[in-house]
Amino acid sequence: MAMNTETLSLIKQSIKTIPNYPKEGILFRDVTSLLENATAYKATIDLLVEHYRSKGFTKIVGTEARGFLFGAPLALGLGIGFVPVRKPGKLPRATISQSYELEYGHDSLEIHTDAITANDKVLVVDDLLATGGTIEATVKLIRQLGGEVQDAAFVISLPDLGGEARLTALGLELVKLCEFEGE
């Protein structure tokens, strides 16, 4: 994806790295510092809108919670609907759920059963791609409802954690605005 290197540099430099959080040996990439910088936040959304404007998406699906912060403004910029995927018990209408594995245990996500139809071409958006488990579960939910999903966008990717390979194996084309080495 050809994007303005100056803008991509602004985005990457706006993301603070917190050593040893949430545990020793981890370099935490704090996307909230990007949100605090209005210029960088707007540039992030503008780049994604520009890239996806002519792709024909009908819905954006964002994963709880930081996927909402990028998915919803992107949906507005594209003039299409936004669908949240949430933890169990947070959505008021009928839902379906999908479990997925975590490093220690498992979790699940839910989506409204009427939020996606067979006519929908869906873009999945999240702030960060690590192992890919959350997005894999999200893709399964969308496909179970009949939606077409072949694309996912992330502000940050941590390629060493294997998520990119996991999601490309699902047939997804990935857009990542910046990458960081390590965990």
Swiss-Prot record:
GO terms for biological process: adenine salvage; AMP salvage; purine ribonucleoside salvage. Pathway: Purine metabolism; AMP biosynthesis via salvage pathway; AMP from adenine: step 1/1. Pfam families: Pribosyltran. It catalyses: AMP + diphosphate = 5-phospho-alpha-D-ribose 1-diphosphate + adenine. GO terms for cellular component: cytoplasm. Its EC number is 2.4.2.7. InterPro entries: Ade_phspho_trans, PRibTrfase_dom, PRTase-like, UPRTase/APRTase. It is found in: Cytoplasm. One of its GO terms (molecular function) is adenine binding. Signal peptide: none annotated. It is an enzyme of class 2 (transferase). Disulfide bonds: none annotated. Keywords: Cytoplasm, Glycosyltransferase, Purine salvage, Transferase. It comes from the Bacteria. Belongs to the purine/pyrimidine phosphoribosyltransferase family. Catalyzes a salvage reaction resulting in the formation of AMP, that is energically less costly than de novo synthesis. Homodimer. This is Adenine phosphoribosyltransferase. The gene is apt.
